[in-house]
Amino acid sequence: MSNRPELLAPPEIFYDDTEARKYTSSSRIVEIQAKLSERALELLALPEDGVPRFLLDIGCGSGLSGETLSEDGHHWIGLDISASMLHVAVEREVEGDLLLGDMGQGLGLRSGVIDGAISISAVQWLCNADKSSHEPRLRLKAFFGSLYRCLSRGARAVFQVYPENIAQRELILRQALQAGFGGGLVVDYPHSTKKRKEFLVLTCGTVQTSIQTSKNEYDESCSEDDNSDDEESEEVGVSDRNRPRKRQRTNTKVKGREWVLRKKEQSRRKGKNVPADSKFTSRKRRTRF
Protein backbone atom coordinates (compact mmCIF):
# COMPACT_ATOMS: atom_id res chain seq x y z
CA MET A 1 0.00 0.00 0.00
CA SER A 2 1.26 3.47 -0.85
CA ASN A 3 2.34 5.72 2.00
CA ARG A 4 1.33 8.87 0.14
CA PRO A 5 -1.77 10.25 1.91
CA GLU A 6 -3.16 11.90 -1.24
CA LEU A 7 -3.55 8.43 -2.78
CA LEU A 8 -5.52 7.07 0.18
CA ALA A 9 -8.40 9.55 0.51
CA PRO A 10 -9.36 13.19 -0.16
CA PRO A 11 -7.69 15.61 2.31
CA GLU A 12 -10.93 16.59 4.05
CA ILE A 13 -11.58 12.89 4.75
CA PHE A 14 -8.04 11.69 5.41
CA TYR A 15 -7.37 14.41 7.99
CA ASP A 16 -10.31 13.70 10.28
CA ASP A 17 -10.36 14.45 14.02
CA THR A 18 -8.18 11.46 14.89
CA GLU A 19 -5.58 12.01 12.18
CA ALA A 20 -5.45 15.77 12.79
CA ARG A 21 -4.60 15.32 16.48
CA LYS A 22 -2.18 12.50 15.72
CA TYR A 23 -0.43 14.67 13.12
CA THR A 24 -0.09 17.67 15.42
CA SER A 25 1.07 15.67 18.45
CA SER A 26 3.94 13.99 16.60
CA SER A 27 7.22 15.62 17.67
CA ARG A 28 8.93 14.38 14.50
CA ILE A 29 6.33 15.99 12.24
CA VAL A 30 6.45 19.23 14.24
CA GLU A 31 10.23 19.37 13.80
CA ILE A 32 10.06 18.64 10.06
CA GLN A 33 7.32 21.22 9.52
CA ALA A 34 9.37 23.85 11.36
CA LYS A 35 12.46 23.22 9.23
CA LEU A 36 10.50 23.25 5.96
CA SER A 37 8.67 26.43 6.95
CA GLU A 38 11.93 28.16 7.86
CA ARG A 39 13.39 27.19 4.50
CA ALA A 40 10.29 28.42 2.64
CA LEU A 41 10.39 31.70 4.55
CA GLU A 42 14.05 32.07 3.64
CA LEU A 43 13.29 31.53 -0.06
CA LEU A 44 10.59 34.22 0.11
CA ALA A 45 13.48 36.68 0.42
CA LEU A 46 11.42 39.28 2.29
CA PRO A 47 13.10 42.66 2.91
CA GLU A 48 14.99 42.73 6.20
CA ASP A 49 13.67 46.12 7.28
CA GLY A 50 11.83 45.01 10.41
CA VAL A 51 8.40 45.68 8.87
CA PRO A 52 5.88 42.83 9.36
CA ARG A 53 4.45 41.40 6.14
CA PHE A 54 1.00 39.98 5.42
CA LEU A 55 1.56 36.38 4.34
CA LEU A 56 -0.63 33.51 3.18
CA ASP A 57 -0.17 29.91 4.36
CA ILE A 58 -1.83 27.57 1.86
CA GLY A 59 -2.73 24.20 3.33
CA CYS A 60 -1.98 25.54 6.81
CA GLY A 61 -3.38 22.49 8.62
CA SER A 62 -3.18 22.89 12.39
CA GLY A 63 -0.97 25.97 12.11
CA LEU A 64 2.47 24.38 12.52
CA SER A 65 3.97 26.31 9.61
CA GLY A 66 2.11 29.45 10.66
CA GLU A 67 3.96 29.43 13.98
CA THR A 68 7.21 29.97 12.07
CA LEU A 69 5.70 33.02 10.39
CA SER A 70 4.53 34.40 13.74
CA GLU A 71 7.93 33.84 15.33
CA ASP A 72 9.46 35.90 12.53
CA GLY A 73 7.09 38.75 13.34
CA HIS A 74 4.74 38.51 10.35
CA HIS A 75 0.94 38.54 10.13
CA TRP A 76 -0.66 35.67 8.26
CA ILE A 77 -3.84 33.96 7.21
CA GLY A 78 -4.14 30.23 6.67
CA LEU A 79 -6.30 28.27 4.23
CA ASP A 80 -7.11 24.58 4.56
CA ILE A 81 -9.80 22.19 3.35
CA SER A 82 -9.82 20.06 6.52
CA ALA A 83 -12.18 21.39 9.18
CA SER A 84 -10.64 19.02 11.73
CA MET A 85 -7.19 20.50 11.15
CA LEU A 86 -8.53 24.03 11.58
CA HIS A 87 -10.30 23.05 14.80
CA VAL A 88 -6.98 21.86 16.21
CA ALA A 89 -5.39 25.14 15.10
CA VAL A 90 -8.09 27.08 16.98
CA GLU A 91 -7.50 24.98 20.10
CA ARG A 92 -3.78 25.72 19.85
CA GLU A 93 -4.63 29.45 19.66
CA VAL A 94 -2.51 30.23 16.63
CA GLU A 95 -2.05 33.92 15.88
CA GLY A 96 -3.14 33.81 12.24
CA ASP A 97 -6.66 34.03 10.84
CA LEU A 98 -8.04 30.77 9.43
CA LEU A 99 -10.12 30.08 6.32
CA LEU A 100 -11.92 26.86 5.41
CA GLY A 101 -11.80 26.35 1.66
CA ASP A 102 -10.63 24.33 -1.34
CA MET A 103 -7.62 25.90 -3.04
CA GLY A 104 -8.57 24.06 -6.23
CA GLN A 105 -11.62 26.32 -6.52
CA GLY A 106 -9.57 29.52 -6.20
CA LEU A 107 -8.53 31.53 -3.16
CA GLY A 108 -11.18 34.26 -3.29
CA LEU A 109 -8.91 36.96 -1.85
CA ARG A 110 -8.68 40.64 -2.81
CA SER A 111 -6.19 41.60 -5.50
CA GLY A 112 -2.70 42.64 -4.47
CA VAL A 113 -3.12 42.31 -0.69
CA ILE A 114 -0.69 39.43 0.00
CA ASP A 115 3.04 40.15 0.42
CA GLY A 116 4.08 36.52 0.10
CA ALA A 117 2.76 32.96 0.23
CA ILE A 118 4.10 29.62 1.42
CA SER A 119 2.74 26.10 1.22
CA ILE A 120 4.16 22.98 2.83
CA SER A 121 3.27 19.60 1.30
CA ALA A 122 -0.10 20.70 -0.06
CA VAL A 123 -0.08 21.61 -3.77
CA GLN A 124 0.50 18.02 -4.98
CA TRP A 125 -2.99 17.17 -3.67
CA LEU A 126 -4.42 19.11 -6.64
CA CYS A 127 -2.90 16.56 -9.03
CA ASN A 128 -5.42 13.94 -7.90
CA ALA A 129 -9.03 13.75 -9.05
CA ASP A 130 -10.93 12.88 -5.88
CA LYS A 131 -14.31 13.50 -7.52
CA SER A 132 -15.70 12.92 -10.99
CA SER A 133 -15.95 16.68 -11.46
CA HIS A 134 -12.29 17.24 -10.60
CA GLU A 135 -9.86 17.96 -13.44
CA PRO A 136 -6.31 18.45 -12.06
CA ARG A 137 -5.27 20.82 -14.83
CA LEU A 138 -8.28 23.09 -14.34
CA ARG A 139 -7.95 23.02 -10.54
CA LEU A 140 -4.28 24.00 -10.77
CA LYS A 141 -5.20 26.73 -13.24
CA ALA A 142 -7.83 28.15 -10.88
CA PHE A 143 -5.43 27.99 -7.94
CA PHE A 144 -2.43 29.66 -9.58
CA GLY A 145 -4.61 32.24 -11.33
CA SER A 146 -6.27 33.36 -8.10
CA LEU A 147 -2.92 33.33 -6.28
CA TYR A 148 -1.33 35.54 -8.93
CA ARG A 149 -4.14 38.08 -8.56
CA CYS A 150 -3.99 38.32 -4.76
CA LEU A 151 -0.20 38.72 -4.57
CA SER A 152 1.35 42.17 -4.64
CA ARG A 153 3.64 43.10 -7.51
CA GLY A 154 7.05 41.44 -7.15
CA ALA A 155 5.92 39.17 -4.29
CA ARG A 156 7.05 35.57 -4.09
CA ALA A 157 5.27 32.30 -3.46
CA VAL A 158 7.21 29.27 -2.22
CA PHE A 159 5.73 25.77 -2.38
CA GLN A 160 7.38 22.74 -0.83
CA VAL A 161 6.02 19.86 -2.90
CA TYR A 162 6.25 16.09 -3.11
CA PRO A 163 5.37 15.32 -6.75
CA GLU A 164 4.69 11.64 -7.34
CA ASN A 165 6.47 11.62 -10.69
CA ILE A 166 7.92 13.83 -13.41
CA ALA A 167 4.51 14.26 -15.05
CA GLN A 168 3.07 15.82 -11.88
CA ARG A 169 6.08 18.10 -11.52
CA GLU A 170 5.75 19.31 -15.11
CA LEU A 171 1.99 19.78 -14.74
CA ILE A 172 2.43 22.01 -11.69
CA LEU A 173 5.21 24.03 -13.32
CA ARG A 174 3.30 24.46 -16.57
CA GLN A 175 0.16 25.76 -14.91
CA ALA A 176 2.17 28.15 -12.73
CA LEU A 177 3.95 29.63 -15.73
CA GLN A 178 0.75 29.91 -17.75
CA ALA A 179 -0.81 31.87 -14.88
CA GLY A 180 1.87 34.53 -15.33
CA PHE A 181 4.45 33.54 -12.74
CA GLY A 182 8.18 33.47 -13.29
CA GLY A 183 10.61 31.41 -11.29
CA GLY A 184 11.85 27.88 -10.99
CA LEU A 185 12.52 24.82 -8.90
CA VAL A 186 14.97 24.79 -5.98
CA VAL A 187 16.10 21.32 -4.91
CA ASP A 188 17.82 20.80 -1.57
CA TYR A 189 20.08 17.73 -1.37
CA PRO A 190 19.40 16.70 -5.00
CA HIS A 191 21.63 13.60 -4.73
CA SER A 192 20.06 12.27 -1.54
CA THR A 193 17.03 10.01 -1.68
CA LYS A 194 15.90 10.57 1.92
CA LYS A 195 16.75 14.25 2.40
CA ARG A 196 15.77 15.54 -1.05
CA LYS A 197 13.33 18.46 -0.82
CA GLU A 198 11.79 20.37 -3.74
CA PHE A 199 10.66 24.00 -3.50
CA LEU A 200 8.80 25.75 -6.29
CA VAL A 201 9.80 29.43 -6.05
CA LEU A 202 7.52 31.74 -8.05
CA THR A 203 7.58 35.50 -8.53
CA CYS A 204 4.55 37.64 -9.33
CA GLY A 205 5.44 40.27 -11.91
CA THR A 206 9.11 41.18 -12.22
CA VAL A 207 11.30 38.08 -12.08
CA GLN A 208 14.23 38.24 -9.67
CA THR A 209 17.12 36.32 -11.17
CA SER A 210 18.92 35.55 -7.90
CA ILE A 211 17.60 33.05 -5.37
CA GLN A 212 19.08 33.21 -1.90
CA THR A 213 20.19 29.85 -0.57
CA SER A 214 21.73 28.93 2.75
CA LYS A 215 22.84 25.50 1.61
CA ASN A 216 26.31 24.81 0.21
CA GLU A 217 26.45 24.56 -3.55
CA TYR A 218 27.29 21.18 -4.99
CA ASP A 219 31.00 20.72 -5.67
CA GLU A 220 31.47 18.76 -8.88
CA SER A 221 35.05 17.92 -7.89
CA CYS A 222 33.97 15.78 -4.92
CA SER A 223 34.86 12.10 -5.09
CA GLU A 224 32.37 9.35 -5.84
CA ASP A 225 32.86 7.97 -2.33
CA ASP A 226 31.24 11.09 -0.86
CA ASN A 227 27.92 10.29 -2.56
CA SER A 228 27.08 7.76 0.16
CA ASP A 229 27.30 10.38 2.93
CA ASP A 230 23.87 11.91 2.29
CA GLU A 231 23.42 13.10 5.86
CA GLU A 232 26.65 15.10 5.91
CA SER A 233 26.36 16.83 2.53
CA GLU A 234 24.26 19.94 2.06
CA GLU A 235 23.53 20.57 -1.60
CA VAL A 236 21.20 22.78 -3.53
CA GLY A 237 20.17 22.49 -7.15
CA VAL A 238 18.49 25.46 -8.79
CA SER A 239 16.59 25.23 -12.05
CA ASP A 240 15.31 28.54 -13.40
CA ARG A 241 12.20 28.57 -15.53
CA ASN A 242 10.82 31.62 -17.32
CA ARG A 243 7.48 31.97 -18.95
CA PRO A 244 7.93 30.95 -22.61
CA ARG A 245 7.23 33.52 -25.26
CA LYS A 246 5.09 32.71 -28.24
CA ARG A 247 7.13 32.29 -31.37
CA GLN A 248 6.14 34.40 -34.33
CA ARG A 249 5.25 32.40 -37.38
CA THR A 250 7.59 32.92 -40.29
CA ASN A 251 6.82 31.87 -43.82
CA THR A 252 9.83 29.85 -44.92
CA LYS A 253 8.36 29.12 -48.38
CA VAL A 254 8.99 32.09 -50.68
CA LYS A 255 6.65 32.15 -53.67
CA GLY A 256 8.95 33.18 -56.53
CA ARG A 257 8.47 33.65 -60.28
CA GLU A 258 8.55 29.93 -61.08
CA TRP A 259 5.72 29.25 -58.63
CA VAL A 260 3.58 32.04 -60.15
CA LEU A 261 4.18 30.80 -63.71
CA ARG A 262 3.27 27.26 -62.71
CA LYS A 263 0.02 28.40 -61.06
CA LYS A 264 -0.90 30.49 -64.10
CA GLU A 265 -0.32 27.52 -66.39
CA GLN A 266 -2.57 25.37 -64.22
CA SER A 267 -5.30 27.99 -64.45
CA ARG A 268 -4.99 28.11 -68.26
CA ARG A 269 -5.47 24.34 -68.45
CA LYS A 270 -8.69 24.75 -66.49
CA GLY A 271 -9.95 27.21 -69.08
CA LYS A 272 -9.67 30.29 -66.94
CA ASN A 273 -8.87 33.75 -68.32
CA VAL A 274 -5.27 34.39 -67.25
CA PRO A 275 -3.19 37.51 -68.12
CA ALA A 276 -0.25 36.93 -70.46
CA ASP A 277 3.22 36.46 -69.02
CA SER A 278 5.62 39.39 -69.15
CA LYS A 279 8.80 40.67 -67.56
CA PHE A 280 6.64 42.18 -64.80
CA THR A 281 5.15 38.83 -63.79
CA SER A 282 5.77 38.09 -60.08
CA ARG A 283 7.66 41.36 -59.69
CA LYS A 284 7.03 43.19 -56.43
CA ARG A 285 5.22 46.50 -56.78
CA ARG A 286 6.76 49.69 -55.54
CA THR A 287 5.48 51.12 -52.27
CA ARG A 288 3.24 54.13 -52.91
CA PHE A 289 1.75 56.56 -50.47
From Swiss-Prot:
<dbReference type="GO" id="GO:0010078">
    <property type="term" value="P:maintenance of root meristem identity"/>
</dbReference>
<keyword id="KW-0808">Transferase</keyword>
<keyword id="KW-0539">Nucleus</keyword>
<feature type="compositionally biased region" description="Acidic residues">
    <location>
        <begin position="219"/>
        <end position="237"/>
    </location>
</feature>
<protein>
    <recommendedName>
        <fullName>18S rRNA (guanine-N(7))-methyltransferase RID2</fullName>
        <ecNumber>2.1.1.309</ecNumber>
    </recommendedName>
</protein>
<dbReference type="GO" id="GO:0048527">
    <property type="term" value="P:lateral root development"/>
</dbReference>
<dbReference type="GO" id="GO:0005654">
    <property type="term" value="C:nucleoplasm"/>
</dbReference>
<comment type="function">
    <text>Essential protein. S-adenosyl-L-methionine-dependent methyltransferase that specifically methylates the N(7) position of a guanine in 18S rRNA. Requires the methyltransferase adapter protein TRM112 for full rRNA methyltransferase activity. Important for biogenesis end export of the 40S ribosomal subunit independent on its methyltransferase activity. Involved in the pre-rRNA processing steps in the nucleolus leading to small-subunit rRNA production independently of its RNA-modifying catalytic activity. Supports cell proliferation.</text>
</comment>
<dbReference type="GO" id="GO:0005730">
    <property type="term" value="C:nucleolus"/>
</dbReference>
<keyword id="KW-0678">Repressor</keyword>
<keyword id="KW-0489">Methyltransferase</keyword>
<feature type="short sequence motif" description="Nuclear localization signal">
    <location>
        <begin position="268"/>
        <end position="275"/>
    </location>
</feature>
<dbReference type="GO" id="GO:1990110">
    <property type="term" value="P:callus formation"/>
</dbReference>
<keyword id="KW-0963">Cytoplasm</keyword>
<dbReference type="InterPro" id="IPR039769">
    <property type="entry name" value="Bud23-like"/>
</dbReference>
<keyword id="KW-0346">Stress response</keyword>
<feature type="region of interest" description="Disordered">
    <location>
        <begin position="215"/>
        <end position="289"/>
    </location>
</feature>
<dbReference type="Pfam" id="PF08241">
    <property type="entry name" value="Methyltransf_11"/>
</dbReference>
<dbReference type="GO" id="GO:0016435">
    <property type="term" value="F:rRNA (guanine) methyltransferase activity"/>
</dbReference>
<dbReference type="InterPro" id="IPR013216">
    <property type="entry name" value="Methyltransf_11"/>
</dbReference>
<dbReference type="GO" id="GO:0048364">
    <property type="term" value="P:root development"/>
</dbReference>
<comment type="similarity">
    <text>Belongs to the class I-like SAM-binding methyltransferase superfamily. BUD23/WBSCR22 family.</text>
</comment>
<dbReference type="GO" id="GO:0005634">
    <property type="term" value="C:nucleus"/>
</dbReference>
<keyword id="KW-0949">S-adenosyl-L-methionine</keyword>
<dbReference type="GO" id="GO:0006364">
    <property type="term" value="P:rRNA processing"/>
</dbReference>
<dbReference type="Pfam" id="PF12589">
    <property type="entry name" value="WBS_methylT"/>
</dbReference>
<dbReference type="InterPro" id="IPR022238">
    <property type="entry name" value="Bud23_C"/>
</dbReference>
<dbReference type="GO" id="GO:0048471">
    <property type="term" value="C:perinuclear region of cytoplasm"/>
</dbReference>
<feature type="compositionally biased region" description="Basic and acidic residues">
    <location>
        <begin position="255"/>
        <end position="264"/>
    </location>
</feature>
<dbReference type="GO" id="GO:0070476">
    <property type="term" value="P:rRNA (guanine-N7)-methylation"/>
</dbReference>
<feature type="compositionally biased region" description="Basic residues">
    <location>
        <begin position="243"/>
        <end position="254"/>
    </location>
</feature>
<dbReference type="InterPro" id="IPR029063">
    <property type="entry name" value="SAM-dependent_MTases_sf"/>
</dbReference>
<keyword id="KW-0698">rRNA processing</keyword>
